[in-house]
Regions:
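Interfacial "coupling" helices/loops that link adjacent transmembrane helices in transporter permeases
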Residues: 289-309
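Mid-to-C-terminal secondary-structure elements
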Residues: 115-141, 150-276
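Short amphipathic beta-strand/extended segments in non-transmembrane regions
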Residues: 60-63, 77-139
């Protein structure tokens, strides 16, 4: 049967059984819509592209203390330095304050409240994403920071560069004010760059000197493992070094243990099993809808046959 013939048959069916056509259309529409939506969610979560270099080697490093009910505790500055100096599993570790901090950015077209994300010297470079303009932080930036007691340079987002600074080509080296203090732009990150997937509104990343607060637990540690190193090996070494640092401070390690998680898992957990189950359940609903529509069409066909007898 041609497409034109199918259309004529559909119109005849619509005139004869308008209620059936509406119910069948709604049933199939809801089933297909729900299945498509759930598939999109599963696909997005399972295949979310972080955009980082060698993301399979990227991890987040926590400390846990089960005896104190602590499941995720950021490592101290001392532990991070000990891992980089004495360890053999981490290529780099960067620290960043997730969540950002509200500040006032002025000196552009107009003053506005924005979010900054404090980072250490490796906080941006650890993910392996090159800036669109300029550079990210270098050790000498932090030497100046220690002398001046405050950050003097910032790396801005592409959105901030375009929307708040007019996309000026000579933005590198320009000075603006953050909460009334002068700051110099040293880099612009690429469009769409996010250190954390759910933080879309970070205006810039600001240098922070953690050496002044060596035992602070306010940052999240993102690490890059050396090639060939497994998560289990990194976790074992991090546990040993964390306990050694605590003992050197005179603290009792107790049940302290490192927890090293692949970055994608740390950000999104393990939702695949649950989402796949939900996708299967929704697909089953679509199957039921198709069966119901088929039964309604068969019943309508049988009724039409009886009337023609």
């Amino acid at each position: 049967m041609s497409v034109l013939g199918d259309l004529r048959y559909a119109l005849r069916l619509w005139k004869r059984y308008p209620t059936l056509v509406v119910v069948a259309g709604l049933s199939l529409g809801l089933g297909v819509g729900a299945t498509t939506t759930m598939y999109s969610v599963v696909n997005r979560v399972s295949h979310y592209e972080l955009g980082f270099k060698d993301v399979d080697r990227m991890v987040i490093f926590w400390n846990t203390q089960p005896d104190k009910g602590i499941d995720r505790q950021p490592p101290t500055w001392e532990v991070v330095q000990a891992l980089l100096k004495n360890g053999s599993t981490f290529e780099a570790i960067g620290l960043a304050q997730f969540g950002g901090a509200p500040v006032t950015l002025s000196g552009a077209a107009e003053s506005s409240r924005v979010l900054q994300m404090p980072v250490d010297v490796n906080g941006l470079s650890v993910v392996g994403v090159s800036p669109l303009l300029g550079r990210t932080y270098l050790p000498e930036d932090f030497e100046d920071l220690i002398k001046q007691k405050e950050a003097r340079s910032i790396v801005i987002s592409h959105e901030t560069w375009q929307r708040r600074l007019g996309g000026m080509e000579d933005v590198i080296g320009k000075s603006f004010h953050v909460d009334g203090e002068p700051r110099t732009v040293i880099g612009v990150m690429p469009r769409g760059f996010k250190l954390v997937p759910w933080e879309d509104h970070i205006a810039f990343w600001a240098a922070n000197d953690l050496s002044r607060i060596p035992q602070a637990r306010w940052m999240v540690a993102m690490g890059r493992l050396k090639p060939g190193v497994t998560v289990a090996a990194a976790e074992a070494e991090a546990t040993t070094i964390s306990r050694q640092v605590m003992e050197a401070r005179g603290d009792k390690p107790g049940t302290t243990k490192a927890r090293v998680e692949p970055l994608h898992q740390a950000f999104f957990g393990r939702p695949e099993d649950v989402l796949t189950f939900l996708l299967g359940a929704v697909s089953f609903v679509l199957l039921i809808a198709c069966a119901n529509v088929a039964n309604m069409l068969l019943a309508a066909g049988a009724a039409g046959s009886c009337r023609s007898c």
